[in-house]
Amino acid sequence: MMTKHEEIQKGVIFPAGEKNEAYAQVFTGQSYLNMLVNDPEVSVGVGNVTFEPGCRNHWHVHTDGYQILLVTGGEGWYQEEGKPARRLRAGDVVVTHKGIKHWHGATKDSWFEHLAITSGNSEFLEPVTDEVYEGLENQ
């Protein structure tokens, strides 16, 4: 299978960062993380997250805050529980409010990158099953 958007593996606007070992247990596949704001006086996290093709995070909720995703490259998915998945491309913006169960990640044949601006804590839940993920390509 041909992989799309391979140029993203080096980063689009910001460098892709290191392998995301700290969160590897809540991802299916390989992701990379470059935290862009490391100021302890700033109450939001800002990170550049890069996903290899097929990589996605587990279902999760932001328990006491929110998350804004600014898509910078590639093709990916965003899905809230009980709703159809949304295909994401560069320029798309997603706002996830407190308590909404969701996941996001790359399509199976494309690299994907977004900036994640996150306030508060995240609670990671079960993985997105292969059955659910593979079914998205048919939407």
Predicted regions and their residues:
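A short beta-strand-loop-beta hairpin characteristic of the jelly-roll/cupin
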Residues: 56, 61-90, 100
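Ligand-binding loop in jelly-roll beta-barrel domains
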Residues: 40, 77, 85, 89-90, ...
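A structure-centric signal for secondary-structure junctions around beta-strands
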Residues: 43-45, 65, 111-112
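Conserved hydrophobic/aromatic positions in well-ordered beta-strands
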Residues: 34, 47-49, 69, 115
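A short, polar/proline- and glycine-enriched secondary-structure boundary/capping micro-motif
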Residues: 69-70, 89-90, 115, 125-127, ...
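A short, N-terminal "cap"/entry segment at the start of jelly-roll beta-barrel domains
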Residues: 1-44, 124-139
